[in-house]
Amino acid sequence: MTNTSPQIEGFFDPATSTVSYLVLDPATRRCALIDSVLDYDPKSGRTSTASADRLLARVAALDARVEWLLETHVHADHLTAAPYLKEMLGGKIGIGQHIATVQQVFGKLFNTGDEVARDGSQFDHLFADGELFSIGALQCRALHTPGHTPACMSYVVSDGTYGAAFVGDTLFMPDYGTARCDFPGGDARTLFHSINKVLSLPEHTLLYMCHDYQPGGREVRYVSTVGEERTGNIHVRNGISEEEFVAMRTRRDASLEMPTLILPSVQVNMRAGHFPEPEANGIR
């Protein structure tokens, strides 16, 4: 591994099928944590930090310093552990600047009133499309890739050759396809264009997924390449038109159930991982 190559490690959470990532610059020991998970029991409403503590332990073992706590979007299927990790490790919580749109939409749905600022100010940094940033000496670029939600971002990390992209819920492994677009603010046509934006990267670019649902009961996989997605993705491989994709995605979305954790997840995640204020009886 050269000093310009990132060390990337994935951490799979079987309860939510979510993959969190640690991205380390070996030269400087600076790192980013992407799409962390705060464990949540929907029956009791209790949280735990078991998944996040795996990241804590690994950061300590690597003697690394956290610069970024990155969110690819406001997740609807798990709660972020970013505030906990920030308290323990430091770093800036970052998300796409269109988080304000998500807060506007869900602020109305959840009737948050003035309790939730709808300008993204809960986050430490709001990324613009194409914005350059760094993890240690690693050069990175934020790409706005909406469709699943209005605020979805992909983060591209250069390694001096083809690089790696953390694509959130834009794409899945080729045998599972693409993300749903039926949440408020989602749009299948927009997602098609965002996917093409990702697939315009060099064909050997590594793509790191936010989820793997193990179709057919196969083993967990969460890394593919641009080339593999172009030729093999069951929803958007070469030859599938925009109209065909939109029709397929619309039909499929109509058959899907809502995620188990959508109500707590969106309320917490649009607040950068902070819980809503307690009600008058002290219960959140």
Short names for language-model regions:
Residues 157-207:
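A contiguous binding-surface segment within folded domains or other stable secondary-structure elements
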Residues 2-7, 98, 186, 193-284:
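Accessory terminal helices/loops
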Residues 4-65, 155-168:
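Conserved beta-strand hairpin/beta-sheet module of binuclear metal-dependent hydrolase folds
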Residues 10-14, 116-117, 122-124, 144-148:
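Short Gly/Pro-enriched turn/cap motifs at secondary-structure boundaries
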Residues 31, 41, 79, 175, ...:
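Conserved protein kinase catalytic core
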Residues 38-139, 163, 231-232:
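Active-site HxH/HxHxD metal-binding segment of metal-dependent hydrolases
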Residues 36-38, 74, 98-99, 148-149, ...:
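Active-site metal-binding loops of divalent metal-dependent hydrolases
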Residues 69-79, 143-152, 208-215:
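Histidine-centered catalytic micro-motifs
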